[in-house]
């Protein structure tokens, strides 16, 4: 997090300004004194020209009179001259000159100039970047009670810039600034209480400091408060409060708040679902470069308006920022030639970008492509590696495919025990192919003791999800009473489902089962199947 921005408002003159008539009188008096070389009068006259108080505003004349006062060593004027040089007011923007005048005022102990000089050193503007010098000048201003400098000192200790990282010292300076009501320091102090860095974790205290900052209009604090209300984290879950705080931050251009408002309207969380409102917030956030918002706009154009050309524009913006979900979606568009000519190599390029960042679907899809040689040379070892990466994220299809490759005698690492372990992990997540594979293993006693009851259970889990071969095997077991009770009606039901799915041999088994059934039972089960189908 960078230091807080430099001060930009000129210091006030000591002249009284109450009405236009008095301004004119002041002007005449000050002008006479200024022309005689009175530095304070020159400074006050510069202030009047800067603000257009009683006279026509003129940055050029403000610069002139500030310059005369500054040349006489008046620190207020030196500071204001530095501000005008830094902002390019009445003169071409010149950080070198700004640093020169800040230095003059800072060496006289002027805290605001010390702060701004520290900021220029921190940013390397007009001076060589020097964290040590930034630290020095922030320290001098902070010791005079300047809250912004105290906050920036805290940040330098926080990040180890110019000093060894020291969370305790960071908190010390944040607290000094926070107790003066400095919103950014209040927020930073809240973050430390939230994370328990340099202080005993106290999330209630964290929330209290964040609220103080939020109520002063500090957008990151408003966003954090909204998150707490949205998720019921520390604060009671309250969608209305969450939306209110997101709106306050979003109104200040806080991109993550704009994005979260888009999500809320997109999903109808605490408000009626409103896709147009969601899009409006996504557009605001995306316009500020928010990658997730750009990705969601891409999804809208792809799946809503089916404008693949616009979709790829937004995906590309997010993908260029390294957003893995957008990289994956861009790969899909290249693969299928949607919104652009199909290009297998570009698809693989973007899949790999996403996969390298841990995008589980991209890892799985790369595994498939290396297994089957789609867009890349076939390489079962690489296929296994990508499946393994996705499997480690508990992605059940990858766990299953990892098992399949370990099961292959011609695979890169044949290991039937490892295959069985992979199937178990996938099956526990409800993956029907893995459940069927475990059913077969228990049915045949492969790597596990033969156990028809266990086979029955695994087949049943897969069959209920529509796995046709599991339906066939379960039907055969029910017809023979193997692993479970002999039940011809259940056998007929499962075999009928297998027949409907076109499983070889199922129709013959169904006829054989029907031949063993009583006519009344056969009528009843056929009526049951008709009712299900109808």
Label every PLM stretch briefly.
Residues 2-4, 504-534:
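Terminal, low-structured helical/coil segments at or just beyond the last alpha-helical repeat
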Residues 439, 475, 486-488, 494-495:
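Predominantly extracellular beta-rich ligand-binding scaffolds that present long acidic/polar faces
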Residues 2-51:
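N-terminal segments that cap or nucleate solenoid repeat domains
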Residues 44-51, 80-87, 116-123, 152-159, ...:
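Hydrophobic face of amphipathic alpha-helices that form TPR/SEL1-like repeat modules
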Residues 22, 35-38, 51-53, 58, ...:
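Short helix-capping/linker turns of helical repeat alpha-solenoids
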């Amino acid at each position: 997090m960078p230091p807080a921005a430099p001060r930009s408002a000129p210091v006030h003159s000591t002249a009284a300004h109450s009405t236009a008539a008095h301004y004119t009188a002041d002007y005449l008096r000050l002008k006479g004194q200024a022309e005689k070389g009175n530095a304070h009068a020159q400074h006050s006259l510069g202030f009047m020209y800067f603000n257009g108080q009683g006279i026509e505003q003129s940055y050029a004349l403000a610069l002139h009179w500030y310059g005369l006062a500054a040349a006489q060593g008046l620190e207020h004027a030196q500071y204001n001259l530095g501000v005008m040089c830094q902002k390019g007011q009445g003169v071409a923007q010149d950080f070198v000159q700004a640093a020169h005048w800040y230095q003059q005022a800072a060496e006289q102990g002027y805290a605001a100039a010390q702060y701004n000089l520290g900021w220029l050193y921190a940013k390397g503007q007009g001076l060589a970047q020097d964290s040590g010098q930034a630290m020095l000048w922030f320290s001098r201003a902070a010791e005079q009670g300047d809250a912004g400098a105290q906050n920036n000192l805290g940040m330098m200790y926080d990040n180890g810039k110019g000093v060894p990282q020291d969370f305790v010292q960071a908190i010390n300076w944040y607290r000094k600034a926070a107790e003066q009501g400095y919103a950014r320091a209040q927020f930073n102090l809240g973050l430390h209480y939230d994370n328990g860095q340099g202080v005993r974790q106290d999330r209630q205290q964290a929330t209290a400091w964040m609220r103080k900052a939020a109520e002063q209009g500090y957008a990151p604090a408003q966003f954090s408060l909204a998150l707490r209300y949205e998720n019921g984290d520390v604060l009671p879950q309250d969608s209305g409060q969450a939306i209110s705080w997101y709106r306050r931050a979003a109104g200040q251009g806080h991109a993550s708040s704009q994005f979260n408002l888009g999500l809320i309207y997109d999903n109808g969380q605490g408000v009626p679902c409103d896709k147009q409102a969601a899009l409006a917030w996504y557009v605001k956030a995306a316009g500020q470069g928010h990658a997730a918002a750009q990705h969601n706009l891409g999804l809208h154009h792809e799946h809503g308006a089916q404008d693949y050309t616009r979709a790829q524009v937004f995906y590309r913006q997010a993908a260029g920022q390294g957003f893995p979900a957008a990289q994956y979606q861009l790969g899909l568009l290249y693969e299928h030639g949607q919104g652009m000519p199909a290009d297998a190599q570009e698809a693989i390029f973007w899949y790999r970008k996403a996969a390298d960042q841990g995008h589980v679907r991209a890892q799985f899809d790369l595994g498939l492509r290396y297994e089957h040689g789609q867009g890349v040379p076939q390489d079962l070892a690489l296929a296994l590696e990508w499946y393994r990466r996705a499997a480690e994220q508990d992605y059940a299809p990858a766990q299953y495919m990892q098992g399949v490759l370990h099961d292959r005698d011609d695979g890169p690492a044949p290991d039937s025990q490892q295959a069985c372990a992979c199937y178990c992990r996938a099956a526990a997540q409800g993956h029907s192919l893995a459940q069927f594979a475990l059913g077969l293993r228990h049915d045949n006693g492969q790597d596990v003791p033969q156990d028809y009851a266990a086979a029955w259970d695994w087949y049943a889990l897969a069959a209920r999800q529509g796995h046709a071969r599991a339906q066939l095997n379960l039907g055969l077991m029910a017809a023979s009473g193997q692993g479970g009770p002999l039940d011809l009606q259940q056998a007929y039901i499962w075999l009928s489902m297998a027949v409907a799915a076109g499983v070889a041999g199922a129709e013959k088994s169904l006829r054989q089962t029907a031949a063993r059934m009583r006519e009344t039972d056969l009528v009843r089960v056929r009526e049951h199947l008709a009712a299900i189908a109808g």
